[in-house]
Amino acid sequence: MIFVTGATGLVGSHLIYSLIEKGLNVRALYRKNIPVFKGSEQVQWIQGDLLDVNSLQEAMQGVTQVYHCAAIVAFSPKQAAAMLQANVEGTANVVNACIQHQIQKLVYVSSVAALGRIRENAPVDETMNW
């Protein structure tokens, strides 16, 4: 079983579609509404939140792989605290749950925003500090 966070977003929903097309069993986390997209009816949906350790513990029962695609991207200073909480504490919760459940593979999806401000015309590659 594969568990996907961020399944209601652009990257997560496309990932799920790809996994289902390969015939894999997928479980995914949602907060409020189960999304409707091609293949979504084949997903085992679990209502929960990255900040709710118990929902993550439940979701990872019987899972061998986790794709962590969930994050908040915010540019407003008013949203900075919520963004940090979800992205830092939420990710820590996912990692800790993976360790507790002896997950074989954790894939963490991020964005170029993790690099912060970059000098103009500076090369961006995997050797950069973040």
Predicted regions and their residues:
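Short glycine-/acidic-enriched loop or helix-start segments at secondary-structure transitions
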Residues: 13-15, 38, 77-78, 117-120
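N-terminal Rossmann NAD(P)H-binding glycine-rich loop of SDR-like oxidoreductase domains
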Residues: 2-24
